[in-house]
Amino acid sequence: MINNRENMSVSERLISSRQNRQLDEVRGRMIVTACALIMIAASVAITIFLGVKGLQSFLVNGVSPIEFLTSLNWNPTDSDPKYGVLPFIFGSFAVTILSALIAAPLGIAGAIFMTEIAPNWGKKVLQPVIELLVGIPSVVYGFIGLTVLVPFIAQFKSSGTGHSLLAGTIVLSVMILPTITSISADAMASLPKSLREGSYALGATRWQTIRKVLVPAAFPTLMTAVVLGMARAFGEALAVQMVIGNTRVLPESPFDTAGTLTTIITLNMGHTTYGSVENNTLWSMGLVLLVMSFLFILLIRYLSSRRKV
């Protein structure tokens, strides 16, 4: 009888333990599913809200979409208001592309140095620096650019201050450099050792191995890092606003002042009446930013699919 009771007790404990594990699994699934649904709902709600607000200037206020995207005139407070945002679209693309042209070579070169040239101590030295740069707030970058970079650039201009497209480009290139470097370093470190060993076995030097074997193998991921950096640069507002000048005209040179979509939105949104034409056109500019973010995401997914192939 005692053995039977002990066997029943053991079996009951096993059943109870199994039921508890099943309950824990169900709870875990429910929590994860709820979090995923909240994220999806928030993303959909933001997209719908921004889409509805962004389209009101065209559907309700009668602003021409063609004029909005192609006109060079932005003067919403004039007696004959103009709502052309082409200078700001150009400024956003210009500062993004130029900053990527500066940060991409430096970031990829830094990643190669960390993983291939000095793998033992390079990462120990550079990784904390990269993490420090990532953690610095945008306003600090902007303040340093305003107090150091802008006066320096002003020395090379015949008139005016040093606020310019060049200042915004340099500040943004420093801001996106950690993103490009860290992702590129992970890409280089994830390459199989057989690539390096096979190249060395064929008599290639370290530089030949890096240039002709490793970089081509990691190229899709390296481009993903660059695109992620560009996506951050395109959406940055505060740091750029402090140094770029925020003018309404197309810049003719890197030393000219400029404006971007994000800087104009942050400068003007608080000074407009909710629901007014100017307010709705600012929401339309936000919709343009959202569309560009989707395009960056699609480009990243395309590059990621190439990497898997």
UniProtKB/Swiss-Prot annotation:
Localization = Cell membrane
Sequence intervals crossing the membrane: 30-50, 88-108, 133-153, 165-185, 214-234, 280-300
SUPFAM superfamilies associated with the record: MetI-like (SSF161098)
Q: Kindly list the GO CC terms recorded for this protein.
A: plasma membrane
Keyword Ribosomal protein in annotation: no
Any one GO biological process: phosphate ion transmembrane transport
Q: Which residues form the ABC transmembrane type-1 domain?
A: 89-300
Q: Its membrane topology, per UniProt?
A: Multi-pass membrane protein
Which GO molecular function annotation, any one, does this entry have? phosphate transmembrane transporter activity
Enumerate the UniProt keywords alphabetically.
Cell membrane, Membrane, Transmembrane, Transmembrane helix, Transport
Q: What does this protein do?
A: Part of the binding-protein-dependent transport system YqgGHIJK. Probably responsible for the translocation of the substrate across the membrane.
This protein is called what? Probable ABC transporter permease protein YqgH
Supply the source organism's classification: Bacteria, Bacillati, Bacillota, Bacilli, Bacillales
